[in-house]
Structure formats: C-alpha cells, structure tokens
C-alpha cells in the first residue's frame, strides 16, 4: 500500500499516536515517487527508440527498393545524344601480305551533362590540365551555362586521358564508348589510305566516314555491317612501301627538293605495290585542308596522282615507239639533229651539240630534243594525239583514289605541229606520275595497257594493245641502253637489269614562260628489262645537286641515283634474284 504524504501537524500527531516514525514514512513515500517517475521515463525512451528504429528501417527499405529498380532498368540516355542506330563498325584494310594498314580501336568520347554538373569551373580547370589545348575560360563558361544541357568536350580521348577525366570526380563529366580508326603504321601509305572522320555521333557510338583516299572511295564497302569481319586487301606491300618512302624522303632532303613522289607498279597487272608522296602526314592526326595558298604545298596533296607536271624527256619514249610502230623508222634510221630547229617564232635546242644527225637509237639514248621533234613531224599532230589518247594521257585515271579522278591532264586546245613537236619531248602536256607509270607498263610488257589499281588483283584480263610486241621489245632495249651508256648511267643496279628514261622539264612560270632555274626531274623505267616485272617512277620538284662546285638539276644527277637505291633495296624484298648482266644485255641486244 502506497502511503500518502503527511500533513504537517495532524499527520505527524496521528503517526505518533499509532507508534510510527513520521520521518521514515516520508522517506518511503519519496522513494516510491522516484521509482514511479523513473519507470515512466524508461517507458517513454523505449517508445522513442522503437519509433526511430522504425523510421530508419523504412528509409533504408525505400533506398534499397529504388536501387533495385535502377539496377533492373536499362539506362536511358538523353534522346538527342544517344547512339541508337549508329554503327562504328568498319572493316580492316590489309596489305597484299595480310599486314594491317587500318583497323578499329575501342576508345571513349568525353562530354558534359549539365543537369549533373556540380562545379563547372573546377571541372574546366582540371580538364585544361589534361588537355592543354583547351581554353579553360571558354570551357568554364560552357560548363556553367544554365541554358546549356549538353556539351561535347572531346569526340575521342586516349585511355590515359579517359582515366584522368574520370579521376576528377565530377558527376557531370561522362565518358561514352565508341570506336576510332587506327593506322598502326603512322605516316606509312598515308596518301593511299587517306583518312576518316566522325559523321553522325552519339554518346555511345559514332559513325566513321572516309574523307580521303581509299577510305573515301571504299567507304560503302568498309562500313557495310555484313562485311565488317572481311578485310579489304590492297595491292601495296608494306615492306616495299616503307623502303620507298624512306629513300624518297632521304633523297628529297639530300637534294633540297620541294617535294617528290614515287610509284612501284606491277608491269603486267597494273597493281600498285608502293605509292609515296612527300611531304606526308599522319592519318591518325590528319591536318585540315588548306583554305588559302597553293594546295600543292599541303602535305595532304598526293603528288603521285594529283600533281600535273610537264615531265620532260620521259615523253620521248612515246614519239619513238609510235614512229617505230608505224614503220616510219627503224632503230638505225638516221635523223637530222642539226640545231637550232626553228618553227615560226619557236626555237628548239639540244642540251648538247650532237652534230648533223643521229640514229633513232641514239636520239633516244642521248635524249635529243631536235631529233625527237623531227620524229613528231613525221608522225603528225592528229596521229600523235590519238596515240597518246590510247595510253590514257588525255583523261583522268580510273584508279581507286578520289584525288586522281579530279586530276585532268592539261593539253592544248589546238593540237598544232608546234604542239606535237614540243609534246614529243615533254612540254605542253601535263600529266600525273601515275599516268606515266601505266603508260610505261604498256611500253615494256609487250604492248598492252594496264589499269592502275590499289586493290589486290590476282587475275587480270589483258588490256587493249597499243603497240606491237616487236616495238615493245625494241623499246626495252633502248631503255636499257639509256642506263648502260646514256643519261641514266647512275641508275645501274648490278644484276637487276634496270632500264628507263630521264626527264628534266623547266617549270612553268605562272607569270608566263618557264623558269630558268626550277625543274621537275623524273626517272621512268622498269626492271629487269629483259623480263619486266615492275615499273618505277620517281619524280622530284626542284631538286638540286652540287657536284664539284657546279649546280646540277638534271634527272641523271638527281632522281636517277634515288631510283637506283630504291631498286637496290626493294628487289630482294620482292623475291628477285640478281642475274648475270651479260645475259640480260644479250637478251636485249637489237638484231
């Protein structure tokens, strides 16, 4: 029984009357009240803990349920930037031996989603450290622009850059997977491959499009999803291409030339085994096309198929071949070489005085302009024009490069007698080195035209006949003599029977006439000349060699040694064994 507190006097007296101690009763009452209060507080605390635990449990349950929903639901990106329907697949490009020239590599893009951006200025500062070419202030303005939802920072980043961007820890910076085009050999065969760029882009995919070279011409084939696993095989030989580019580059540097090009072509099939143009570029980091100045000054300019040049004396081969094929002359026919040769107000001279006359054989071997002009007179303008048309000199070449299709040869509107004479020794008709390669293949392969190609072509149908097999045989002998006793004596490569023709043409002056001290030097030939397998064309723009204190610009002193070095190095790579020079020359001796 709980006792009630005593009243001050009455209860004290009452307690004493009953024999109890009032103080003890009061202490007991106080103790009981404290226990009651303590029990009530404990019950309230227990209820509070239960309520707090229930709230925590409910909160965690909601978070867990939301996380489960997010994990089970596929990510939906912002519709304007998604990659649905965009294919980045692209077939590999291989050389003739299966070595990779172009392939795809998985990489990332870097972009910003403003709705998630926490600190745009900090992000811009950190990104500028990763990408030094970025304008930090301009980027900061874009990343903090409240009206902007999305911004491309980089369409392609390296794995190292992607990791560094991720480490910034900014929720508004996103990395999107995509494929990029990779050229593992750098500048090698750059002018053949051309390059690619991104077309339609999304954050998870980007369309790779060819913008130049073979990547452009074969774009539909390379981007066909059904053929993504079927590589495109080219006629190029990576080993030969590497040697040709190295030797050409060294030659240009040594001869202080402005530029140059080189072509190695199968004389029977027209397959281009190597094509080089210098200066060059890296298709992995393709420069922008020039917007002003001379396009030929750009490293993107493919001099082998775009450069239109008056090629000089290498064109004499066609005047001689036509005169022989028409039966107008034989190699021993004597031709007037007394100079100068005057036609109206025009005057034709030789580099050396060859006397009153030379045989057709020696006109070609010693490169007489006057003698060749007399042959052109015998042929006549109409027949000459028709003959050169058969060799493809009057139209663009149908090779698999878009740049070549825009290179239209330049020739006179009126093909007069004077035009025929100057064209016979390489002035007045501007063509590309690739035109010359295809035409020289026909001169040495027995007389049938070939169509130049950059694609692997194991089986070919012979082209139309342009000269007789006998004329081709005579031309092979004359080409060989140019090397053994003529203007290309520095082109001899023991055991490989090199033959060809030199050409040194004064460059046209845009103001009119020709420069006195600027030339285009060319060597056009084939090897081995007793059974021609490959045509070689080397052209340099403004080469110059100093010998004994004398400046020399002619092809015999400049491009011929470069061509010889190419043959010396590529012939073994192409599986060719040296032959006995006496046997080669015996087979080529004119009967």
Language-model-detected regions and their locations in the chain:
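Beta-lactam-recognizing serine transpeptidase/beta-lactamase-like catalytic domain environment
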Residues: 30-33, 102, 262, 267-313, ...
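Periplasmic/cell-envelope proteins involved in peptidoglycan metabolism and beta-lactam response
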Residues: 1-289, 308, 326, 382-394, ...
């Amino acid at each position: 029984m709980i006792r009630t507190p005593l009243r001050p006097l009455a209860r004290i007296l009452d307690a004493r009357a009953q024999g109890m101690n009032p103080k003890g009763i009061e202490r007991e009452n106080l103790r009981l009240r404290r226990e009651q209060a303590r029990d009530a507080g404990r019950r309230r605390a227990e209820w509070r803990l239960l309520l707090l635990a229930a709230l925590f449990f409910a909160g965690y349950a909601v978070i867990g349920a939301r996380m489960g929903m997010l994990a089970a639901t596929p990510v939906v990106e912002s519709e304007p930037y998604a990659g649905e329907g965009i294919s980045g697949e692209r077939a590999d490009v291989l050389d003739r031996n299966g070595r990779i020239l172009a392939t795809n590599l998985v990489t990332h893009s870097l972009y910003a989603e403003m709705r998630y951006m926490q600190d745009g200025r900090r992000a811009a500062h950190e990104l500028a450290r990763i990408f030094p070419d970025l304008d930090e202030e301009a980027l900061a303005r874009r990343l903090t622009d409240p009206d902007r939802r999305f911004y491309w920072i980089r369409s392609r980043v390296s794995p190292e850059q992607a990791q560094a961007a991720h480490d910034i820890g900014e929720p508004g910076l996103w990395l999107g997977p995509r494929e990029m085009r990779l050229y593992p050999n750098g500048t090698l065969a750059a002018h053949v491959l051309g390059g690619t760029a991104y077309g339609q882009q999304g954050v998870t995919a980007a369309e790779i499009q060819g913008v130049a070279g073979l990547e452009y011409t074969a774009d539909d084939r390379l981007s066909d999803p059904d053929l993504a696993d079927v590589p495109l095989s080219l006629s190029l030989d990576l080993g030969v291409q590497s040697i040709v580019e190295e030797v050409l580059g060294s030659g240009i540097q040594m001869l202080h030339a402005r530029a140059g090009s080189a072509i190695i072509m199968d004389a029977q099939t027209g397959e281009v085994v190597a094509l080089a143009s210098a200066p060059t570029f890296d298709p992995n980091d393709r420069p922008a096309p020039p917007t002003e100045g001379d396009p030929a000054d750009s490293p993107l300019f493919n001099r082998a198929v775009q450069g239109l040049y008056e090629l000089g004396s290498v064109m004499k081969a066609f005047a001689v071949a036509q005169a022989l094929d028409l039966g107008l002359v034989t190699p021993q026919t004597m031709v007037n070489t007394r100079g100068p040769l005057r036609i109206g107000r025009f005057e034709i001279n030789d580099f050396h005085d060859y006397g009153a006359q030379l045989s057709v054989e020696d006109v070609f071997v010693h490169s007489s302009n006057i003698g060749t002009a007399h042959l052109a007179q015998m042929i006549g303008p109409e027949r000459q024009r028709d003959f050169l048309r058969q060799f493809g000199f009057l139209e663009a070449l149908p090779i698999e490069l878009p740049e070549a299709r825009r290179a239209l040869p330049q020739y006179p509107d009126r093909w007069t007698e004077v035009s025929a004479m100057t064209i016979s020794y390489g002035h007045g008709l501007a063509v590309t080195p690739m035109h010359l390669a295809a035409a020289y293949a026909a001169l040495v392969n027995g007389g049938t035209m070939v169509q130049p190609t950059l694609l692997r072509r194991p089986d070919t149908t012979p082209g139309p006949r342009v000269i007789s097999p006998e004329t081709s045989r005579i031309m092979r002998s004359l080409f060989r003599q140019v090397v053994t006793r003529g203007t290309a004596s520095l082109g001899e490569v023991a055991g490989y029977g090199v033959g060809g023709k030199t050409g040194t043409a004064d460059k046209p002056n845009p103001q009119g006439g020709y420069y006195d001290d600027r030339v285009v030097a060319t060597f056009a030939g084939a090897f081995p000349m007793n059974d021609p397998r490959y045509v070689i064309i080397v052209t340099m723009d403004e080469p110059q060699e100093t010998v004994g204190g004398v400046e020399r610009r002619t092809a015999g002193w400049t491009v011929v040694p470069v061509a010889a070095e190419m043959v010396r190095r590529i012939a073994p790579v192409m599986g060719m064994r040296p032959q006995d020079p006496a046997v080669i020359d015996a087979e080529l001796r004119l009967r």
